[in-house]
Amino acid sequence: MITKIHTIFNMSLIKTSEEIELIRESAQLVSKTLGMLASEIKPGINTLYLDNLAESFIRDHKGVPGFLGLYDFPNTLCISPNSQVVHGIPNKEIIKEGQILSIDCGVLKNGYYGDHAFTFTVGEVDKEILQLLEITKQSLYVGIEQFKLGNRVGDVGYAIQNYNESKGYGVVRELVGHGLGKE
């Protein structure tokens, strides 16, 4: 516990423009990795296959998988099918038509991390799932609108929560949010 608190107080919360550019380069590799995976996601494959593709792609582009070995995590990606919230471990279970896969990817490149997630559909999915995906996508844009001078991260979260609740959905309150940088 004390080590974690010590780490938090030693983190630089405000980044220089040079640091932001290095984080951007890592994040761009994350985006390219997720984009590459999009064409590979289909019924009949397993998530371990996607994980292996991602690791090779990241390394081929001079990055290091950001999650692999972090807190003993055994894989490159966190892949959470259907209603699993986060941090799913890739395995040999076969992906089926109608599922959704939340894929979280992190990359370390040039000493800085990039990290984001995207939810993919596997073939045709139920109308209710498509509605959920559209509402969560719109809530992202509602949150982005709150990133302005004088606002705090809590203002962003508040806007997202209010939007989702106005549409009959809630928000996950655990395992959400972290900084980016060298750690």
Protein language model regions, located:
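Active-site neighborhoods and metal-handling regions in enzymes and metal-associated proteins
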Residues: 2-183
